[in-house]
């Protein structure tokens, strides 16, 4: 099993934790990570694009002029696509871009993302993460003590409102619960910081 130092909020080492190699020590599968990121980004698309077809645009259904004898090209409706203001042919309509990956693939993607962070030495474990009150200044101090200057993802076992409120105004910092971790956020942050209890919860769910 891989051993990782456990840090306090002040950055001091307070012990070690053994990570489950079946979750944090596998060979990252880049193809699965790619599929997971594409699927998650697809589900974030709004899909509310819409244009009007010839049955929806303004204008009567009357034939604009008689078929023959005018010298002009024959026309059946001013709502035809070749007219200015006419309907669009085969235009976009509202749709959902989301699709689900198989459960085994989703689990493998999470394990691959977590293992990649451990291999890159961008995975930190805190003994605990608690704040007496929602104070952005206090959370900024924690970032400084842990030498976290780039985008950082904090993962707690359960929702802690004081922690979430303290971090929400800090650019590049995201706080999630262990049940809410996802591949896009794991890969989208330089550093990933788990509490000890969050590690145990993830190992329980993915183990």
From Swiss-Prot:
Keywords on record: Ribonucleoprotein, Ribosomal protein, RNA-binding, rRNA-binding
UniProt-listed GO biological process terms: translation
Domain of life: Bacteria
Example of a GO MF term: structural constituent of ribosome
Statement: the UniProt record of this protein carries the keyword Transcription regulation: no
One Gene Ontology cellular component annotation held by this UniProt entry: ribosome
Annotated segments matching region Disordered: 48-81
Xref: InterPro entries: Ribosomal_uL4, Ribosomal_uL4-like, Ribosomal_uL4_dom_sf
Keyword RNA-binding: yes
Quaternary data: Part of the 50S ribosomal subunit.
Stated family: Belongs to the universal ribosomal protein uL4 family.
Function: One of the primary rRNA binding proteins, this protein initially binds near the 5'-end of the 23S rRNA. It is important during the early stages of 50S assembly. It makes multiple contacts with different domains of the 23S rRNA in the assembled 50S subunit and ribosome.
Protein name: Large ribosomal subunit protein uL4
Species lineage: Bacteria, Bacillati, Bacillota, Bacilli, Bacillales
């Amino acid at each position: 099993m891989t051993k990782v130092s456990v840090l306090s909020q002040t950055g001091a080492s307070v012990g070690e934790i053994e990570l489950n190699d079946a979750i944090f020590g596998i060979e990252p599968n880049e193809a699965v990570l790619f599929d997971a990121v594409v699927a998650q980004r697809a589900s974030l698309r709004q899909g509310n694009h819409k244009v009007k077809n010839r049955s929806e645009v303004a204008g009567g259904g009357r034939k604009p002029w008689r078929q023959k004898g005018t010298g002009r090209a024959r026309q059946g409706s001013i709502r035809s696509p070749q007219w200015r203001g006419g309907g669009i042919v085969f235009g976009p309509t509202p749709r959902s871009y989301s699709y689900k990956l198989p459960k085994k693939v989703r689990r493998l993607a999470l394990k691959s993302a977590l293992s990649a962070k451990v291999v890159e030495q961008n995975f930190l474990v805190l003994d605990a993460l608690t704040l007496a009150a929602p104070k952005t200044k206090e959370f900024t101090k924690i970032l400084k003590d842990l030498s976290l200057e780039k985008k950082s993802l904090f993962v707690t076992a359960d929702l802690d409102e004081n922690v979430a409120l303290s971090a929400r105004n800090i650019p590049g910092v995201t706080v999630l619960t262990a049940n809410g971790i996802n591949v896009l956020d794991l890969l989208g942050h330089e550093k990933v910081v788990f509490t000890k209890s969050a590690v145990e919860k993830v190992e329980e769910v993915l183990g």
